[in-house]
């Protein structure tokens, strides 16, 4: 967290990295994240199956919210189905049926799975004929059981003539790649072969980190360069590069990690009496 000394040093009345996304203009977008957001939007609108994978704090939820905000802003006739089961490992086909019924109608879910299945198909068909699209969005999808993952294809196959009734968006962490590996889960190959996989990359360069911080400080009416210099951003990028035992260099510069390091650097600058967070301040941490 930012210390009081840092707040005073940089003339801040609130943490630039806490509660920092309240509207679409607060979202930092790269070419990659714009593409991913548009892909989610088009999947929800026109159909398909996609899995969005990214490390914790990489911005998956923010991108999902950005796509949903666009749907609302453009008044698209798209119904969002979001199962609320906390433990996604316990999410079953029956629970997904319940979510579809409750999010797409005013009916109560039927008791038996057979009755629920018929109810789901009827509700989605009638809604589709009324001009609506439907998208099933599941967060923390890396926790889904393989049997549930396998049966998602059955939901995706629901159709009215040539019209697909349900598109599917899964959002999870990189470990989900193992579940989407046909060699490890042969029984789920039907969905694995049909699902598009998108992965979020870190902000590897100092320039990207600078652009990200520009958005955070601009929201508070502050000039980023007076708080974190360009060479400070480059030093942050270097700090957030790691190396495997095999010598492969990779970056962990995801938004959540950048936020934490920027706070530490600002606290350090305040302690050292530095004018701003520059490379020397970053390298002293």
Positions of the model-derived regions?
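Conserved catalytic segments around the Walker B and adjacent sensor/switch elements
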Residues: 73-87
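Conserved P-loop NTPase "ATPase switch" module shared by AAA+ and STAND
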Residues: 126-148, 152
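Walker A/P-loop nucleotide-binding motif
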Residues: 45-66
